[in-house]
Amino acid sequence: MSKKHPIISVTGSSGAGTSTVKHTFDQIFRREGVKAVSIEGDAFHRFNRADMKAELDRRYAAGDATFSHFSYEANELKELERVFREYGETGQGRTRTYVHDDAEAARTGVAPGNFTDWRDFDSDSHLLFYEGLHGAVVNSEVNIAGLADLKIGVVPVINLEWIQKIHRDRATRGYTTEAVTDVILRRMHAYVHCIVPQFSQTDINFQRVPVVDTSNPFIARWIPTADESVVVIRFRNPRGIDFPYLTSMIHGSWMSRANSIVVPGNKLDLAMQLILTPLIDRVVRESKVA
């Protein structure tokens, strides 16, 4: 953690909705005049697409059917930790881009399934913003959570997460439901052991909960809408959080525990703006006087 060069980390698994949260952060940064440098978590995957397939085949032949991008070993976590530490100490660092599709390939000049070259951060940023799978990892080799000043978890209930992933991968990547189901099953071990423990490290968790039947996510025709959901927002340390103000400003919200507030799904963006804007202002203000 660094007062002078703060780091904000948003963590969630594939299909959790971290990209939507990133959009809200971008709005806050733009409105508040905050210059952020960004890391997309897949920039720190260890393998490109072809090498990942070869590694999957090798491990499957050896009897390991649990290896996935969720796994610690599939990612350059020591390098990510090093970049977090370097940024916290100096405001400098580097990242790259993983190219997913032809549209990104046209912009970057790199074939889909490969990485761009490493590039340095701009030197005049106010903070570092990370969005990905491993922004709050603590294990025997790395402590990434300890280097982030504000850690956000995005954690839909698991059936909703699966529905979102199935629909996204079918729509944008051309996968069949069966293929996505196989990926979900293969990732389950790492999901339990690598992804879920991070949400005990986060400062705030946003958990979307549908209020319609999602009991069989593999046949769901539609993703539950915001109007068909509520969002549970849990604060690790509720001291200083003005819950009466939040419940008065967010129509239909209520406190479910001393450290949790529930908001209608269509009020999530407003809730994030109200909760996160003062936190971002504080870390930026403290960085300027550090």
Curated annotation (Swiss-Prot):
Q: Which GO terms describe its molecular function?
A: ATP binding; phosphoribulokinase activity
Asked whether the keyword Transferase is assigned, the reply is yes
Tell me its EC number(s), please.
2.7.1.19
Q: Which reaction does it catalyse?
A: D-ribulose 5-phosphate + ATP = D-ribulose 1,5-bisphosphate + ADP + H(+)
Name its pathway.
Answer: Carbohydrate biosynthesis; Calvin cycle
TM segments? none
Catalytic class of the enzyme: transferase
Residues involved in ATP binding: 12-20
Q: Any idea which UniProt keywords this protein has? A: ATP-binding, Calvin cycle, Kinase, Nucleotide-binding, Photosynthesis, Transferase
Q: Which InterPro entries does this chain map to?
A: P-loop_NTPase (IPR027417), PRK (IPR006082), PRK/URK (IPR006083)
Q: Which NCBIfam families match?
A: PRK15453.1
- Quaternary form? Homooctamer.
| Full protein name | Phosphoribulokinase 1
**Which organism was this protein described from?**
Cereibacter sphaeroides
